[in-house]
Amino acid sequence: MCELLGFSASQPTEINTLVSEFFSHGKDNPHGWGMMSSSGMYKRCERADTSSELKRLVKKLPPQTTYLGHIRFATVGSIKDENCHPFSALDITGRSWTLIHNGTIYSASKLIPFVHHQSGDTDSERLFLYLMQQLNAAQKEKPLDIYHRCELIDDLVKDLSPRNKLNLMIYDGELLYIHKNMKQTMKYREHGAGVIFSTNALDDAQWKDVPTAQLQVYKDGKLVFEGTKHNAEFVPTLQYINANDAMHI
């Protein structure tokens, strides 16, 4: 499966060692890497752990207040730059939204129309385009403050979680939204002036499990919103487990 990395802090914090460890997992997720930092957004369809470009970016990475990282194991969509995460766009107010996703969308007919509008061919990009459509529609009716943005994202993840694996991180230029609906697939711990989130623990420190099936929203390293706990936990079937094991052979 893909792996996700997120960071939110109140002041610039050095995360190079943790980021380097995260991207070393590229050998098991060889189909691309991507990152969003204060230096910009970069993504390539190459192995993260052998990418000279990525090594240079991580080495030069300045202290961060917000960071997103992704390594891809392709399950839906071909292997090309357009299918690598993050996905990013401006809403109608000029706010920048960025998404990384780990999972598969098995059931979501409302995403089908976006097949004709996406740059690549992943379900993750269709998910992002649907998110942007819903945000723009809501903002045409009224401005969305922090609370209303949290409510909207909470409603979206509750709506899309049933029968889908929806582990994701979203950054809107101010808030970091965290959601997982499969147990033991995302952890977090405090780091410096903030909190770091990762699919897998990145060192020997004490990591905690991110709550399952409940949106968590952070601002400047602090939890500012908890969504409604929902029941759409993704429980992998034997077929799902066997298919993922086969892809790693």
Locate predicted features.
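Extreme N-terminus nucleophile/cap motif
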Residues: 1-52, 178-179, 195, 213-215, ...
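Conserved beta-strand-loop-short alpha-helix elements that form
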Residues: 2, 97-107
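Short helix/loop capping segments that flank catalytic or ligand/cofactor-binding pockets
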Residues: 15-16, 77-79, 107-110, 178-180, ...
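Short acidic (Asp/Glu) patches
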Residues: 45-57, 71-94, 111-113
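A short, Trp-centered hydrophobic/proline-enriched beta-strand micro-motif
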Residues: 67-70, 167
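Glycine-rich phosphate-binding loop plus the immediately following alpha-helix
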Residues: 107-138
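Catalytic core of PPM/PP2C metal-dependent serine/threonine phosphatase domains
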Residues: 141-182
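A conserved acidic, glycine/proline-rich C-terminal tail/linker
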Residues: 184-219
